[in-house]
């Protein structure tokens, strides 16, 4: 039986360590981008974002302007609807939770693990969500993994999920920025994006993330493509090198 693998891209600096040959291989695989990964000029099959104005708007803008065939998922933990710039509302394949009626509804529940009283236990949430909903645990990573399982993944490979208080991939090195980021660098005409997110990734408490991954690992095989990821060093997940199309001959 063929096992389905989905690759999930975050924004850690290890994204810059992926080789051209590995990117070529990844273009043939099923992929999910989330958070600010859209700043990388790489088309994923699916994209997940939640909350705020700048992040989902920037992702939608990038998907549309590059004519990517990407299905866009939005999750909402706020009372107010997520705002995606009107220019792009009707141009992307999009599912959105708890918001407007111009797209399909993809219902879900998201909360942060450091809240005093999570509304449900992990067991209850998984039973309610893993077939047809999304949930998050301490941010977007768990929602992206949950999305992968909804899409039928037996195995998830994490790329750019470093959790080592390093930099974002787009703050260092040459990463071939997207059209959106090039415009952002030139001072976007969309005022809130002029000085948007660009700083070191800091995790004051990674335990909710590691605890969540330990639990979800009971249901899906999770590995990391970065040997220096905190998740690998703490033994939460195993390291697995990203393949290429080249045949290695010893």
Residue ranges and their predicted role:
Residues 1-250:
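Metal-ion/cofactor- or nucleotide/acyl-coenzyme-handling active-site neighborhoods
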């Amino acid at each position: 039986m063929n096992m389905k693998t989905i690759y999930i891209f975050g924004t850690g600096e290890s994204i810059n360590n992926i080789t051209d040959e590995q990117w070529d291989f990844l273009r043939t695989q099923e992929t999910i981008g989330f958070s600010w990964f859209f700043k990388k000029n790489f088309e994923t099959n699916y994209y997940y974002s939640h909350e705020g104005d700048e992040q989902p708007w920037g992702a939608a803008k990038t998907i549309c302007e590059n004519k990517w065939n990407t299905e866009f998922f939005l999750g909402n933990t706020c009372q107010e609807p997520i705002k995606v710039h009107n220019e792009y509302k009707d141009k992307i394949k999009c599912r959105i939770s708890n918001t407007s009626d111009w797209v399909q509804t993809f219902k879900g529940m998201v909360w942060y693990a450091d809240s005093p009283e999570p509304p449900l236990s992990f067991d209850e949430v998984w039973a309610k969500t893993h077939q047809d909903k999304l949930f998050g645990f301490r941010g977007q990573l768990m929602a992206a993994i949950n999305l992968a399982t909804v899409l039928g993944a037996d195995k998830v490979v994490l790329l750019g999920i470093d959790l080592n208080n390093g930099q974002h991939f787009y703050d260092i090195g040459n990463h071939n920025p997207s059209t959106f980021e090039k415009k952002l660098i030139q001072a976007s005409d969309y005022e809130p994006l002029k000085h948007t997110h660009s700083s070191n990734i800091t995790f004051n408490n990674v335990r909710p993330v590691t605890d969540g991954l330990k639990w979800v690992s009971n249901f899906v095989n999770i590995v990391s493509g970065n040997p220096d990821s905190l998740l690998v060093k703490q033994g939460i997940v195993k390291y697995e090198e990203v393949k290429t199309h080249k045949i290695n001959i010893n």
